[in-house]
Curated annotation (Swiss-Prot):
Protein name: Large ribosomal subunit protein uL6m
Family, similarity comment: Belongs to the universal ribosomal protein uL6 family.
Entry's Gene Ontology BP terms: translation
Signal peptide (from-to): none
Cellular-component GO terms for this entry: mitochondrion; ribonucleoprotein complex; ribosome
Keywords associated with the record: Mitochondrion, Ribonucleoprotein, Ribosomal protein
Protein's organism: Acanthamoeba castellanii (Amoeba)
GO MF, any single term: structural constituent of ribosome
Gene: RPL6
Amino acid sequence: MELLKVIKSQDKITLKTEKVNKNVFFYFKNKKKILLKITFSGELFLKERTLITLNNLNYSNYSNYIKFMAKNLETFFYDQYNYFSKLHMIGLGFKNFILRKHLYILVGDCNYIIFRIPDSLKIFCKKNQVFILGESNVEIFNFMSNIKRVKKSNFYKGKGVLQFKNFKFTKLKVGKKQRFM
């Protein structure tokens, strides 16, 4: 853990470490935290519309000091948005990725299904998971329902496009026991 000095300017705050001469830039807009640029070994540029999680970074604000701790930066982004939801794609043949403002999903077919991402939502993907952040719960639910309509989920096997908050596995009824003589 290192303590960093804060150098204030008009729109951005520059943080300089005393040991290493590296800069970190944060940008505050309407009392919201937005990460603008991080320079460690290379340069990484983030704008308001992009959403990227960086491992092992988290900050808490003190008077003229910011302390970095070993946690994920996902909590940094959750402060901007009120609602969050996660979709799991369980089964064979599921692939997803984001290209520009479109979400591409392969659901066991030979063609990708393309969804246009609304401006009010932020979406990022892992292997078989889609994370959706937004300002209203209705917009998130509408976008998730469009994705769920693509492939009908099988509740008995637990496969398909699932949201685990509302999902419950249904158990099959046990058959009659056979007698052996």
